[in-house]
Amino acid sequence: MKPIAIDDFCTVRSLANVTFSPEGTSACFTVSQAKKEKNCYKSRLYLLKGGRVRALTGGGKESSFCYLDENTVLFAGDREGEKEPSLTSRFYKIALDGGEADLAYTFPIPVSQVFPLKNGDLLVVGSTFPGFEDLYKGDKKLVKAYFDDKKENEDYEVISQLPWWWNGGTYTRGAYESLFYYDAKKKSLTRLTDAGFNVSDVQLAEDQKTVYFSLLDVSVPRPAHFGGQDLYRIDLASRRQKLVVKSRPDFVIATYALGKSFLLVMAADGKFGMNTDCDFYKLDYETLAVTPYAVYGEAIGSSVGCDVRHGGGQAFKMDGDVLYFISTRFDGAGLYKLEDGTVSPVLVRDGSVDCFDRKNGKMLLCALWDMKPQELYDETGRRVTHFNDAMLRGKYVAQPDPLNLTAGDHEVHGFILKPMDFEAGKKYPVIFDIHGGPKTVYGPVFYHEMQYWASRGYFVIFCNPTGSDGRGAFMDIRGKYGTVDFDDLMAFCDEALAKYPEMDADNLFETGGSYGGFMTNWIIGHTDRFRACASQRSISNWTSFYGVSDIGPDFSEDQCGSTIWPDVEKFWWHSPMKYADKVKTPTLFLHSLEDYRCPVDQGYQMYSALIAHGVESRLVLFRGENHELSRSGKPKHRIRRLNEITGWFEQHKG
């Protein structure tokens, strides 16, 4: 068997956005792959029809699409090139029976979504900017004025609201998405939603008479990004906008789905903070009355961690009045349905269903099953694509051994990967990997970095402590960071060492990112059991995180279970920086300079504290990367990251 190499994630092809044609005779989806030489990702559209799979495009930048009709697909792209600065968006159409893609639509603003209408027109979701709200009209003088203003002010940032930047982006500057109607004959856009409001979650009714969407007022100093968004609809004949239902603290709307006879709202009561899971509610189309439909309280969508997933897709869809949806339960994500107020499983296996579509009783699921990267499966669970067979052929893929234990009044679920060429009685070093979130889960899925370490001769252990997803409010961690979660992690580590005598307790290493980075920082201040640790994109100080993260004020107060004024001592108690003078463990810190979720100052603080106290430490910073470095960062940067962590552990082996 050959080992998994450090750059093998570049040979993985990731599938996403699987979508049936209007009549269900074909399906399209995207396939993405990292390209190490060009240090980028390429994405193409693929077609599944009659049991055959073939590439539909070859440009390498096709990631969003929709069906124009049964035999034509519309996708975003830019094959023309621009000689001057431009905001222009272009969409191309291609026939499923072959031929070249043709330019179909050109818009004067950045466009993220289009919804084809039966009359040949479109609904369009596009970006607009404060002070230049009429850019959608295509006035060249206004476009020039926009770029002149941008250049004139490029040395300044004027901040007037929270959050003032977003992870991986830049300062918010109040940009927002609006809904437009596109007249195909006149080739013109008409604004449907007012300036100063951000549109999201747009859904077109099946009869195409009404469009629904969430709306958020972004003109105020502190938009309610985490307070749920209000649901509106527009009658396309009259262009009249109507409020359908408002979010409130005890009814935080996450999303919704359009059924045949009612609208299904997924909303949380907020009893467990911003991570409260949703229940289901029925909304009458005529009266707009909202009534409880089903108590659920579990996660909707997949939160199973993975580093070979690129792209998204549907997590739920209504078929008549039956909701099909992905839900994370315990250590995996499966497909379920809600019918007549009752939830039941449809297709649940070890691993994760990442997205799906359903049409005329047929289904296609993009899933991480059988310890393989993503493939497509049908409604019976039969695999219908084989994109990643070749990359796994002849390679050692460690199979996860479940390890569950009782810790106090709850169970902790986890997994063990054995090293390549494992021999009973022989000692092996151990890497303990802690997930982010904390409201995510580790599951039995192909995780490149873990497989790489197993191929390098390490045991890899990982688990889902208190605070993880998949178990409803039972795992609530608010106000308890560094207490029960720390106890769970240490208990799991103890159990793993006891069950596998081949694990070398003198060569025990630990790493984690985001919440896992917080726990790494906490661990090194509370135990010396690890030979070396690697803290990635971490939180070290809740009092400063409050003011620098894009989610700082909301997330820090929610997760600390209090308000920073007057309870600053509680925030400090839960901060790893408070205990930095106790650290003895050699620690590597990795941060991305455009990570505004867990900003680099958090790493600076811990690194400075360790050096000041004479503890061996190293800080590695990545330019041009953000919070997603380990999952979608530039391929060469991902390799460097993994080399840094692995090299740090190798350097400190006993």
Question: Which residues make up each language-model segment?
Answer:
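Beta-strand C-termini and the immediately following turn/loop, strongest in propeller blades
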Residues: 28-37, 68, 74-83, 124-129, ...
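Non-catalytic accessory segments flanking enzyme active sites
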Residues: 16-19, 156-160, 165-166, 170-178, ...
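Predominantly five- to eight-bladed beta-propeller fold
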Residues: 43, 128-180, 225-230, 278-281, ...
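Blade-terminus and WD-like Trp-Asp/Gly-His loop motifs, strongest in beta-propeller folds
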Residues: 19-26, 64-72, 114-120, 202-210, ...
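Active-site-proximal cap/loop segments of hydrolase catalytic domains
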Residues: 465-654
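Cap/lid segment of the alpha/beta-hydrolase catalytic domain
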Residues: 387-506, 513, 547
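Structural motif
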Residues: 38-44, 83-91, 132-137, 176-178, ...
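Multi-bladed beta-propeller domains
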Residues: 1-14, 47-63, 85-87, 94-110, ...
